[in-house]
């Protein structure tokens, strides 16, 4: 009997060892830990549908029925060309490699007092995000959706963060939905003042940011700054639905202390939920190279000429 039990124990130990090895070999690069193919549901949907013909909850984010695996802990992806699919990240994600693709992923972050995004691609190159969701598990004044550089974002949804997208050079946001951002009365990053919510913020000394056919709707966010805030050269804002903010689009040269060039805002439809009657605010040394085809969404009538002041 003792000998039989020794065989059983040895067999169980061998099976456990084999499972551990298989899990390690099959674990994608950048993972700290993950549950064994446990399905997980995307975070609950909030907000309202996008306007007809524009992205909304039904056309962005993780498709219904997608099997998702939970990944816990902060992750760094340093392997060129890696494809990451069907993950729910409970932790902050950083990309340092070239050509990493995230497909059908959910970014939830973790509790933190540090200012950081759910996904940071600033140190990578040619990152692609497709059909993904950004929604913090622990909303705070510190958490943005994505800090992006050399990144293409398609059919993705951002909600519950302070800013949706902080965009650096060569960032494209297309067919995506940014809405219901989180406002806080006290933001250490704003000197203790309230949060300064932007759907997309494009930074000074950056260039080539493109926003194409998105819904960026801050009409349900308390006291937002702008749907689009930009100090980046060669900005393109094309064929979007835009709403909310003090002014809906705010183009500002002042962080540069030089003229801001190549701003193109064309073919957009504007809501009427800005604090001021101000679809576009243009600072005095900002050049609006093109502004054709911008209309009020409810009437189809052309919007007024940009307000211009610093």
Predicted regions and their residues:
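Secretory targeting and sorting signals
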Residues: 2-25
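C-terminal region of N-terminal signal peptides and the immediate post-cleavage residues
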Residues: 17-41
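Acidic, glycine- and Ser/Thr-rich low-complexity intrinsically disordered tracts
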Residues: 38-70, 258, 262, 266, ...
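N-terminal non-globular leader segments, chiefly Sec-dependent signal peptides
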Residues: 42-56, 122-127, 137-140, 221, ...
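N-terminal segments that cap or nucleate solenoid repeat domains
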Residues: 45-108
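Beta-strand/loop edge motif enriched in small/polar residues
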Residues: 60-62, 70-72, 203, 211-217
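Extracellular beta-strand/beta-solenoid scaffold signature
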Residues: 69-72, 89-91, 109-121, 136-145, ...
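Right-handed parallel beta-helix
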Residues: 81-88, 99-109, 124-136, 148-162, ...
């Amino acid at each position: 009997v003792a000998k039989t039990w020794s065989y059983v124990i040895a067999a169980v130990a061998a099976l456990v060892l084999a499972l551990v090895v298989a899990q390690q070999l099959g674990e994608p690069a950048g993972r700290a830990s993950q549950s064994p193919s446990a399905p997980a549901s995307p975070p609950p949907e909030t907000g309202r549908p996008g306007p007809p013909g524009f992205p909304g909850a039904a056309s962005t984010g993780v498709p219904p029925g997608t099997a998702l695996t939970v990944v816990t802990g902060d992750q760094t992806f340093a392997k060129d060309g890696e494809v990451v699919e069907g993950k729910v990240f409970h932790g902050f994600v950083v990309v340092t490699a070239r050509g990493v693709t995230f497909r059908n992923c959910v970014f939830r972050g973790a509790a933190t007092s540090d200012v950081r995004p759910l996904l940071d691609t600033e140190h990578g190159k040619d990152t692609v995000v497709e059909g993904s969701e950004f929604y913090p598990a622990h909303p705070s004044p510190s958490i943005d959706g994505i800090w992006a550089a050399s990144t293409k974002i398609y059919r993705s949804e951002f909600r519950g963060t302070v800013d949706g997208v902080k965009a650096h050079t060569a960032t494209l946001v297309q067919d995506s939905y940014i809405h219901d951002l989180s406002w806080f009365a006290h933001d250490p990053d704003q000197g203790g003042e309230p949060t300064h919510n932007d759907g997309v913020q494009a930074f000074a000394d950056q260039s080539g940011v493109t926003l194409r056919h998105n819904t960026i709707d801050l009409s349900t966010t308390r006291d937002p700054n702008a749907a689009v805030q930009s100090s980046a050269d060669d900005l393109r804002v094309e064929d979007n639905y835009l709403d909310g903010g003090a002014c809906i689009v705010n183009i500002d040269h002042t962080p540069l202390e030089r003229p801001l060039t190549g701003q193109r805002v064309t073919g957009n439809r504007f809501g009427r939920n800005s604090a001021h009657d101000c679809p576009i605010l243009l600072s005095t040394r900002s050049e609006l190279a093109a502004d054709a085809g911008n209309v009020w969404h409810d009437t189809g009538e052309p919007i007024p000429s940009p307000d211009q002041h610093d």
